[in-house]
Swiss-Prot record:
Entry GO terms, CC: cytoplasm
Function noted in UniProt: Peptide chain release factor 1 directs the termination of translation in response to the peptide chain termination codons UAG and UAA.
SUPFAM superfamilies assigned to the protein according to its UniProt record, in alphabetical order: Release factor
N5-methylglutamine modifications at: Q239
Protein name: Peptide chain release factor 1
Record GO terms (molecular function): translation release factor activity, codon specific
Length: 370
């Protein structure tokens, strides 16, 4: 069990900041500054959770002290029994609450609360890889549905035998990036393809990238320097070709502040039959792309401090294998293996993500030395 006074000192040190923010977020001048207001309301929510935990922690310590006092001085059997029960309950809850508080005190990934851009691409394996990319898309669509998140396809390039060579989606909801970020990496599938006549098991792969969606004030873009083109397209997936040019393509020259190198960014959006909406979504993807690149140094810095990488680092790393003949899923980052592949592919992936979160939290606690 942690030293009670150390945890209380840390919590007490945050009371003044919580009171300061409580006042600031009602200030009209702060509310008018959208960037500052959003940042402060996020900090307020985090500190509010800590203040509630602090209140419970002080209550538990008080309960234990009062119960000890009764047991030392009270002769009435009923009073002593009630005091012992109160002390046992409080002592049982205290270590769990301490762990919760420690995790709350460790700085969280500032991106976790953001929405996300989900990119799935068929890799090695030709048609079968594209089909598997389609299976992963369906898996994530089902998962998003269970979470109450909204998923919208921005762009899709269908495979010749089904599935997708590439599909890009935006996902909006509560703490989307903080949960989906664990899916970034290479997903490998072992199964007999529908096109296989000899019944042989093939290995194919698809890559998944999950990027925190940037807000307008996260990056600076000179919209006057964007070159726009329009073209005819269908809805998501490219079917039903329009007679109007609703698809949009943007080109933007961006200089990487970390390297000083200029590069051209090309983004297409065919999500809707409404050109202004497609422009808006293409801009959102441009902001996210630049934000992701500019924050790569931040991600690399975190990666260099950790011995085991769970949610950040190399997106080309093989993270999970889907073995159909055995009905097995193996996540290689934490040696997690289960044999419910059908349910997993139907969107039941939360348990795996929970195990990854536990592993990452353990790393965060080691870093903080709390």
């Amino acid at each position: 069990m942690a030293d009670n006074s150390t945890i209380l000192e840390k919590l007490d040190g945050l009371v003044a900041r919580f009171e300061e923010i409580s006042t600031l977020i009602t200030d009209p001048a702060v509310i008018a500054d959208q960037k500052r207001y959003v940042k402060l309301t996020k900090e307020y929510k985090d500190l509010d959770d800590l203040m509630k935990a602090r209140k419970e922690y002080i209550q538990l310590l008080g309960n234990i002290e009062e119960a000890k006092n009764i047991l030392s001085n009270e002769s009435d059997a009923d009073m002593r029994e009630m005091a012992k029960e109160e002390m046992d309950n409080s002592q049982e809850r205290l270590p769990a609450l301490e762990e919760e508080i420690k995790l709350m005190l460790v700085p969280a990934d500032p991106q976790d609360s953001k929405n996300a851009i989900l990119e799935i691409r068929g890799g090695a394996g030709g048609d079968e890889a594209a089909i598997f990319a389609g299976d992963l898309f369906r898996m994530y669509a089902k998962f998003c549905e269970t979470k109450g998140w909204k998923m919208e396809v921005s762009n899709a390039n269908e495979g010749t035998a089904g599935g997708y060579k590439e599909i890009v989606c935006s996902v909006t909801g509560d703490n989307v990036y903080g949960i989906l970020k664990y899916e970034s990496g290479v997903h490998r599938v072992q199964r007999v393809p529908a096109t296989e006549t000899q019944g042989r098991v093939h290995t194919s792969a698809a890559s998944v990238a999950v990027l925190p969606e940037a807000e307008e004030f996260d990056v600076v873009i000179n919209e006057g320097e964007i070159k726009w083109d329009t073209f005819r397209s269908g809805g998501a997936g490219g079917q039903n070709v329009n007679k109007v040019e609703s698809g949009v393509r943007l080109r933007y020259i961006w200089k990487n502040p970390n390297t000083g190198v200029a590069e051209e960014i090309l983004i297409e959006c065919t999500e809707t039959r409404d050109q202004p909406k497609n422009k808006e979504r293409a801009l959102a993807r441009l902001r996210t792309f630049i934000y992701d690149k500019e924050h790569q140094k931040y991600i690399d810095d975190i990666a260099s401090k950790r011995k085991t990488m769970v949610s950040t680092g190399d997106r080309s790393a093989k993270i999970r294998t889907y073995n159909y003949p055995q009905g097995r899923i193996t996540d290689h980052r934490i040696n997690y293996t289960i044999y419910n592949l059908a349910a997993f592919m139907d969107g039941d992936i939360q348990d795996c993500i929970d195990h990854l979160i536990v592993a990452e939290n353990a790393e965060r606690l080691k870093e903080s030395e709390l």
